[in-house]
Amino acid sequence: VFAIIMLPLFMIDGLLRMTDIIQMPARFCDESLLKRYLAYVFWRFSKVATLKVALWTAKRYIFKRCYGFYKLFNKVHNNRITFISLRRDDISGNFAFVYDKLKNVDGLDINFILNDHTIADMSFKEIRSFTKACATSKVVVLDEFTPQIHYIDLRPQTKLIQLWHACGAFKTFGFTRLSKPKGSPQTTRNHRNYDYVTVSSTYCKKCHSEGFGIATDNVVATGIPRTDVFFDDAYKKQAQEKFYKEHPNFKGKKIVLFAPTFRGMVKETAFYPTEMFDLETVCQKLPEDYVFIVKHHPFVNDVQPIPKKYKDRIIDLSEDSELNDLLFVTDVIITDYSSLVFEASLLDIPMVFYVFDLEKYINERDFYFDFKLYAPGKIVYSLEQLISAISTNDFCTERIKPFADMFFDYRDGKSTERVVKLICDNLK
């Protein structure tokens, strides 16, 4: 990627050397002008590209050897737990709820590694910290696909627990996507070394077992820790008060949360086709008491600006606010293939599924169930249909309860307790 970014500079450099402003290396002087120029640019490009590959290979080698060193000369500490997340740079989400309980347990040594650095991006200090933590922890907890953990062979004494960030089982992932674009190859080590994966219901066990290439017995229906707040009236009231204090003009209005997922296969290429959701048109067509919260997926960086004339009706909280907290003030959700639908179903929030690219998404990504049959809300394919559904309160709300029943075994606010018990049981 770096070499591609540098390509325009290499081209300019080549032009300067063609005009003798800067001397052309002798090796290129026997060619015709065009061949000389192209050969020089390609040479510069390949040198940088090769250097990046060599650096990545070297760091991966150091990463593995560093882990081997700590594994050889350090013991596993039976009280040590390490949380690793590539999704967040603070203690939030499921980690926050689990940590809040664990910190009250005497004698635990709890560590966090919170950043999105790949092995190639890691400093040598970060490599040491990561590998030492993995080599000496009794339990390692993840909340996302973490490729670094699959480059090393964890000791049998170390238990790897995946608190998968999403509720339910919606979009296919992992080995379920073998035949799909960018799907995992059958030979990959990814995911297979999880000792336990926590899910929201018994129905999800088969999906996660298939997706991660692990035995069904390794998938445990504990519930999802961050959903416990939905059963905490005091927390709900606090979240509402906080939101209205920050956005007082939204109080008493009909709040619509626009929370789509990203398009693209990986974080680096993630996007949302903003031209398909024209904020100005939506505001024009719906009454003034409708206000909007825009909450794009964390992977999406290029989002549309808010029209000046509607700044009092639209706020973009893509980089702020915990998504769960926003649900406490939401009257209607506009989404597509986001796993947000699971949390929304717990709160019985009306939903509209704006899926203008459904067939393409099925071909490229697909679902664990028939989307048209099970989606817990109104399905629309155009902006006009979307506006009509909201205007007429046509949300197909009768589909919400069966959906929630399928994907949640527990609705008791005690999912965190069950996950904490699983972790502590593996410290013994």
Task: Name each model feature, range by range.
Residues 2, 10, 24, 235, ...:
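C-terminal amphipathic helix plus adjacent low-complexity
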Residues 144-146, 200-203, 296-298, 337, ...:
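Helix N-cap/beta->alpha junction signal
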